[in-house]
Swiss-Prot record:
The lineage of its organism: Viruses, Varidnaviria, Bamfordvirae, Nucleocytoviricota, Megaviricetes. This is Putative PAN domain-containing protein R486. It comes from Acanthamoeba polyphaga mimivirus. InterPro entries: Pan_app. The keyword Disulfide bond applies. Residues 80-155, 159-223 form the PAN domain. Gene3D superfamilies: Hepatocyte Growth Factor (3.50.4.10). Disulfide bonds join 80-155, 109-131, 182-204. GO terms for cellular component: extracellular region; virion component. Keywords: Disulfide bond, Glycoprotein, Repeat, Secreted, Signal, Virion. The keyword Acetylation does not apply. It holds the Pfam family PAN_1. Residues 45-64 have a biased composition (Low complexity).
Amino acid sequence: MSQTAIIIWIVVIIILLVLGGLGAYFFYSRYRHRKNIPPTPINPPSSITPIQPINPPSSITPIQPSGPPSGGNHPIPASCPAYQLVNNKAITLVPLPADTSNVKNAQDCQNLCTQNPDCYFYNYVGLFDGCSLMQGTVDNNVMTGFAIRGSEDGCPKWARYNTSIQGFNTGNPSNVESEEKCQQLCQQNSSCDWYTYDIGKKTCTLNKAIDFNTSTLGIKMPH
């Protein structure tokens, strides 16, 4: 090989080495640049709106009852009698404790019932001046209504108490959905002196007082 050819090859090799070095430097510089640039973080939203719970109303309005049946316990006008009197009728129950030794007539017996807040009705037997103050079995799930016969306009048609009173059963109608319906059934039955309606069991019982000569049944009108 001539000297000229050798020189040319040497120059070519030098040029290739220079180009290779420049290329290597170029790629190395890009690599360092990329490595030194921190990655761009994915920022969360400035504020996350939390899901608001659905709050219940501050107060729940209870279902209001429709009120007592017609002729219920309303304020009684002063012109209305304080008692419903039924002659020759009696209810046989265990009487309330009371001193009846001074009772001489039906009015005395009535006065004792008036003075006793637990007395709902009384029996006075004129044959031997017997006076019994009665209440029945108090039960908030039971409503007893006494029919007030011949009451004047504006005066109660029924005397209603949360008590159970046994009498002569004149009917046990089934599927009675309300006290008002039980009251209507008693009103339609001429033998019914009072009804007893069990609110929980939805049972209606129509009752009749016993016939008893010289006896007066006095039913206190609730205020």
